[in-house]
From Swiss-Prot:
Its EC number is 6.2.1.16. The keyword Hydrolase does not apply. The gene is aacs. This is Acetoacetyl-CoA synthetase. Keywords: ATP-binding, Cytoplasm, Fatty acid metabolism, Ligase, Lipid metabolism, Nucleotide-binding. SUPFAM superfamilies: Acetyl-CoA synthetase-like. InterPro entries: Acac_CoA_synth (IPR005914), ACAS_N (IPR032387), AMP-bd_C_sf (IPR045851), AMP-binding_CS (IPR020845), AMP-dep_synth/lig_dom (IPR000873), ANL_N_sf (IPR042099). One of its GO terms (molecular function) is ATP binding. Its main location: cytoplasm.
Amino acid sequence: MSDKGELMEEIMEAKVMWYPDSKKITQMDQFRNRVNRNLGLRLANYNELYQWSVEFYPEFWAEFWDFSGIVYSKTYDEVIDRSKGIADVPEWFKGSRLNYAENLLKHKENDKIALYSAREGKENIEKVTFAELRRDVALFAAAMRKMGIKTGDRVAGYLPNCIQTVEAMLAAASIGAIWSATSPDFGVNGVLDRFSQIQPKLILSVESVIYNGKEHCHLEKLQHVVKGLPDLKKVVVIPYVLPKEKIDISKIPNSMFLDEFLATGKVGDQSPQLEFEQLPFNHPLYIMYSSGTTGAPKCMVHSAGGTLIKHLTEHILHGSTTSSDVIMYYTTAGWMMWNWLITAVATGASLVLYDGSPLVPSLNVLWDLVDRLGITILGTGAKWLAVLEDKGLKPCNTHSLQTLHTILSTGSPLKPQSYEYVYKHIKSNVLLGSVSGGTDIIACFMGQNVSVPVYKGEIQARHLGMAIEAWNEEGEAVLGESGELVCLKPLPSQPTHFWNDENGSKYQKAYFAKFPGVWAHGDYCKINPKTGGIVMLGRSDGTLNPNGVRFGSSEIYNIVEAFVEVSDSLCVPQYNKDGDERVILFLKMADKFEFSKELLKRIKDAIRVALSARHVPALILETKDIPYTISGKKVEVAVKQVIAGKEVPHRGAFSNPQSLDLYRNIPELQNF
């Protein structure tokens, strides 16, 4: 049998792990019935609804605008100009006026818990009701306005995943300021590579965090970050681990503690009123960052309306999320899954914020939270599930998990054996939804779906409105074969533009260079023609993504090549048969210097301090040469192919093609 035949046979034998309850009317069913009624259609199932949603995408988004109950002060004149394609970055819902924060804070069940906040090593769980959340956001916003923050200004968070982070973001959004965040595990270089491009007026941070049983002081890093941001007007420090009295911020210019900052927003003893600037649908909400593969990270600007409506399709339709849900996603505040999670509060659901290691003080820390708080939807990383499996953990024997109906996974492809592990040792009737998308769209192209079965090893379905295909190198759609993940039609949550990209050339190069007019996402995938499910096959570019921590090789180069001992370096991913990724760093030594354990330690320490522990390569090896193109570009992708045992046929583009042979059959890279 041919390889292709074996592949197709394997696809046809996909194993069902979960079936939707045919007796349960989901919000997806309600939406499909509404579309049929309003438009005189007879869409019988999810596949027919999906096909309609991508063919008639303006009608789909218009129907969902009404179905979702989006709050607006002025409705739209036009959903989208149909004559414009995805590469034209068309404006959505032209003429409408709304506010993202107003949509998240619209629920009037004042005493209902909006946010829970749990932290590593802390027994007490903080709680904030919807009424308290509105009050706190109003106070944050008043203080921001008092210091001069206005529509379009940038507000930055160098913060953990906690209540104050959510409140500060919503306050910025209520004004029309643009929020941008990195997590505390980023080093000074990593933060300045991002924030120096957008020049925030205000930065909020904490004095220290707890991770993996250790306290990590944050103030020295913050001090260096502040020095690198000349346009910064104010620094607000939130006491997080230590009480205010034990924190010295005297060395940080223009700094004050949170309570002092919020006090400036009060008028006498009165709490300020919550005000929402009414802004165009395309008004900027977030600046997110690319990994920085080819230089400084690209700054992706995401709109308030686009982020809101795309996230709501995923929460309301694909997840059937309601106000009775309690949702937790294990994420930092700098990862797009945080932004995705926070939008869910618009459904009236309660959110659980967790800061710390998911494995400390015990491997059961997240399962303990599920039972303690009645979590219904738990989001995590594929690697975490694999670790629990390797450790032999069986939560079904130790925990009730009665409330849990959905487990979501992202960050890296979910291995087929992880499906078996979840259904055998965690919960047999849970929806296991592997999701995939990216920072580029601040959302998912595909993922969980309450209307279709879960098949082992597959993402359930392409999301509504997402015209996704797998294309071969000739630009032809393929089924049952690996191909480049592409998107053919506009979507509301694609970036409106890149910051500091006036003519849009960086934007066009990032997504449309490979297939003109078609979004190429940089992932390889395979679409099952029988089930409609998708198997992700890893990155197709030079981005590094070990354990779901996405970053670019240039971030490593900037640090390593500052060492006098190193003349050049190359950083590439290596994949094992299960799709797990690790980072390999090759060093070319400068003349008269030797490769040594002492040098390795200093390099690892430097990467850990400047970026984070999660950026440290799994292996650092010596090499005698590094391949370059004739035009002088370092060639990572070719080395990635060689260490995977593949041939590099087009050697004519290399200035030193013989260097590729140095990376073949390296002993340290075998048996991964």
